[in-house]
Design a protein with these regions (language model features):
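Conserved ABC transporter NBD signature motif
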Residues: 60-71, 75-76
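A short, proline-enriched helix->beta-strand linker immediately N-terminal to the Walker B motif
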Residues: 147-151, 180
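ABC-family P-loop ATPase nucleotide-binding domains
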Residues: 82-140
């Protein structure tokens, strides 16, 4: 029987000299689009890095796509798409050449989706990656992540360098292409996650509140305060 949650985080703790991610717990239901927000330094990226096994946690347990950290294998990792602020590709390759590379790497690679996204995001197919601006690099990273039909997609501040129009194209593409799959968007701008099924607000005391955009505004807590500041 397939588990109801794509991600289960229980008591995740990571301590640095001047910062502690302190026993945070949350679940991400399968097939949902979830936002994780919080002020700078709240630990959003630290949490995601621990979930992906990129840093060693100090305490807690994590289950991703039904696998614990110890059970995680290459086949499961190939079902996960990740876009970080600063994602990189070989500088000498163009998006057109990258298409050939990813056709070999991903069994589920969809070049029709890929080239459609390149066009929508105004990315040149023949230009080398090393000649791309930061915003163009982020657009390409997102196009790649969405084109191999990840079962679980994580975007960590992936749209922070994009203009409003490009961000809207990306958000609409996520909603369309990830239908029935799971996506987690880590963001500082609330506009990035307003349409998410569920939003988690991370603070220095862990998950402060959760709910939809409308529910959190009605509650009048930390999310509503951040929303008012951004208006």
């Amino acid at each position: 029987m397939m588990e109801q949650n794509a991600l289960v985080v229980d008591g995740l703790t990571k301590q640095y000299r001047d910062f502690t991610l302190d026993h945070i717990s949350f679940c991400v239901p399968r097939g949902s689009i979830v936002g994780l927000i919080g002020e700078n330094g709240a630990g959003k990226s630290t949490a995601i890095q621990a979930i992906l096994g990129l840093i060693q946690k100090d305490a807690g347990s994590i289950s991703l796509l039904g696998k614990t950290e110890e059970e995680m294998d290459a086949a499961t990792r190939n079902r996960i798409g990740v876009v970080f602020d600063g994602s990189n590709f070989p500088g000498a390759l163009s998006p057109d050449k990258l298409n050939t590379v990813f056709q070999r790497i991903y069994e589920t690679w969809d070049e029709d989706v890929y080239f459609s996204l390149l066009e929508q995001l105004s990315l040149p197919k023949e230009k080398k990656f090393k000649e791309f601006s930061k915003g163009m690099r982020m657009k390409l990273s997102i196009a790649v992540a969405l084109s191999h039909h990840s079962e679980f997609l994580i975007l960590d501040e992936a749209t922070s360098a994009l203009d409003y129009v490009s961000e809207q194209i990306v958000q609409q593409s996520i909603e369309r292409l990830m239908k029935g799959r799971t996506a987690v968007t880590i963001a500082h701008r609330l506009s990035t996650v307003q349409n998410a099924d569920r939003i988690f607000v991370l603070g220095d005391k862990g998950i402060l509140e959760q709910g939809s955009h409308a529910e959190l505004l009605k509650k009048g807590g930390e999310y509503a305060k951040l929303y008012r500041i951004g208006q």
